[in-house]
Regions:
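Mobile genetic element proteins and their domesticated derivatives, centered on retroelements
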Residues: 1, 32, 36, 45, ...
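Surface-exposed loop/turn segments and immediately adjacent short secondary-structure elements
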Residues: 1-102, 108, 115-116
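Inter-domain linker/hinge segments that demarcate the starts of reverse transcriptase
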Residues: 29-36, 64-71, 120-125, 149-162, ...
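Conserved catalytic palm subdomain of right-hand nucleotidyl-transferase polymerases, strongest
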Residues: 42-49, 87, 99-109, 150-190
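Catalytic palm active-site di-aspartate
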Residues: 45, 84-87, 105, 139, ...
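Active-site palm subdomain of RNA-directed nucleic acid polymerases
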Residues: 121-139, 164, 241-277
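Catalytic palm subdomain of template-directed nucleic-acid polymerases
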Residues: 178-196, 270-292
């Protein structure tokens, strides 16, 4: 939840207004078939049953997945066996020094069944989050009809508006390094409950989804030992991006309180026409509170 900040501005707790999301509704054969049909056929090294077989033998597997999903949603419990990721480091581009870990991008592989369950949840969770007044209207990531183009248009519009008013434009790009890896679970879950009205078994499902996750690294034929993750929204997941957007939603309130224009795409924020001496300390203070 939002906290009090030092300096000239005070940020208060945002509360949810509307109908709570207390349970994920049961899914049908048709729901699962639609999800499977839209999923890419790229195999996962963690799959006991490859995605191509799930698709080609849907008449056999759909009923099993429906039963698994509905039992999971009813109990508010994300299956533990689908919470392990295999991470493969990929060199960001050819020619980079392969001995430096910073030159690699971690590619996280999750099981196909995990992604099926996540997509079934996303169908219900996304409209609930986006329909809340607490979800930033200036976030172009993860929203239907929005993209990097809408983010760029918003930034350009702020520049042109300033030019029309004969004002100088200053644009600041704020990027969070390894942001998905440092999300504090207690803050995220509290924000979902208090600010977005996710409660009861729906919140329990999301709690078990993001907590007690594991991963290991594989390079060639060698695999590391498995490590337990304590602060993360899953890389390579379906739900990770929208959960991260909810986690960082208060950024908009902080920026708007200074009377400036801003726009976001995923974990990138762009600020224009701002009062730097007061805005940046508040922004950095909030970031420190969320990621330490």
């Amino acid at each position: 939840m939002l906290q009090s900040f030092t300096g000239s501005h005070l940020f208060v707790l945002r509360t949810f207004v509307g109908n709570e999301l207390s349970v994920f509704s049961p899914v049908t054969d048709g729901d699962v078939r639609r999800v499977l049909s839209k999923m890419p056929s790229k195999p996962s090294p963690l799959d006991a049953v490859p995605i191509t077989l799930l698709k080609s033998c849907a008449d056999v597997f759909v009923a099993i997945i429906v039963r698994l999903a509905n039992l999971s949603f009813t109990e508010g419990h994300s299956p533990a066996r689908y919470k392990k990721a295999q991470v493969m480091p990929l060199l960001k581009k050819s020619g980079l020094d392969s001995s430096l870990p910073s030159n690699y991008r971690p590619i996280s592989n999750l099981s196909t069944i995990s992604k099926v369950l996540e997509r079934l949840v996303l169908v219900q969770l996304r409209p609930h989050l986006l329909g809340s007044v607490n979800f930033s209207e200036y976030q172009s990531g993860y929203r239907t009809g929005h993209s990097t183009e809408t983010a760029l248009l918003e930034v350009l519009d702020s520049v042109y508006t300033a030019a029309d008013d004969k004002q100088l434009s200053v644009i600041i790009g704020l990027d969070l390094s390894a942001a998905f890896d440092t999300v504090q679970h207690d803050i995220l879950l509290n924000r979902l409950r208090v600010e977005f009205g996710v409660t009861s078994t729906a919140l329990s499902w999301l709690t078990t989804y993001i907590t007690n996750r594991e991963q290991y690294v594989k390079v060639g034929q060698q695999s590391s030992s498995t490590v337990h993750l304590t602060s993360v929204v899953p890389q390579g997941s379906v739900l990770g991006p929208i959960l991260f957007a909810a986690y960082t939603s208060p950024v908009g309130d902080i920026i708007k309180s200074h009377g400036v224009r801003y726009h976001q795409y995923a974990d990138d924020s762009y600020i224009s026409r701002c009062e730097l001496p007061t805005l940046l300390p508040d922004y950095l203070f909030w970031q420190t509170a969320q990621w330490t």
